[in-house]
Design a protein with these regions (language model features):
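Membrane-interface coil-to-helix junctions
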Residues: 19-72, 76
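Transmembrane-helix motifs of polytopic, lipid-linked glycan transferases
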Residues: 78-95, 137-146
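Start-transfer (signal-anchor) and selected internal transmembrane alpha helices
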Residues: 1-17
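Membrane-interface micro-motifs in multi-pass membrane enzymes
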Residues: 38, 49-53, 97, 101-148
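Juxtamembrane/transmembrane-helix boundary motifs in multi-pass membrane proteins
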Residues: 1-5, 65, 69, 73, ...
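Membrane-interface elements of multi-pass transporters and channels
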Residues: 32, 66, 91-99, 118-119
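Core alpha-helical transmembrane segments of integral membrane proteins
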Residues: 72, 76-89, 99-105, 124
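Hydrophobic core of alpha-helical transmembrane segments in multi-pass integral membrane proteins
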Residues: 13-22, 104-111
Length: 148
């Protein structure tokens, strides 16, 4: 039982975030997917690959389409954030009694996504809602692999 105790603050925080997003930001989440079109064609993939960070945008667009049903998109986002917290704990070797520190990157990503306000309509970066989360997760995973 003691082995699963450190994950409880993470799950509690993610549940609180999910309830808040689904209660107050459902319309915003639906509009995010509306303005981020994902096509599963080779042309769309090649078009994104010529841009810097194209694979990141492609994966971000893929996950953004799940906001068509906001609960499903929030579930995907919270899943990425849970993975990020786990990787943060492993990469920085955070002790079990300090596992709350792994919430800091998630809090920063949440603020970054929610503070865009009207800029959601002007953003030219495709998949921008998931791009910082996936990029941070990839960076922390590479750091963990380097330190292992």
């Amino acid at each position: 039982m003691k082995r699963f105790i450190p994950i409880l603050p993470w799950l509690g925080a993610l549940l609180l975030i999910a309830v808040a997003l689904l209660s107050f930001e459902t319309d915003l989440l639906w509009r995010v997917q509306l303005y981020n079109l994902f096509l599963d064609t080779p042309l769309f993939f090649r078009e994104l690959m010529v841009e810097p960070g194209g694979l990141l945008s492609y994966v971000g667009c893929y996950f953004t389409q799940f906001f068509y049903h906001p609960w499903l998109g929030v579930l995907m986002l919270c899943g990425w954030w849970l993975l990020l917290m786990w990787l943060t704990k492993r990469a920085f070797r955070i002790a079990d009694n300090w596992t709350v520190l792994a919430l800091i990157p998630v809090a920063i990503l949440l603020v970054a996504d929610m503070s865009l306000c009207y800029w959601h309509y002007y953003m030219k970066l495709r998949g921008y809602f998931f791009v910082p989360t996936i990029g941070t997760t990839a960076g922390v995973a590479m750091l963990w692999a380097f330190r292992a």
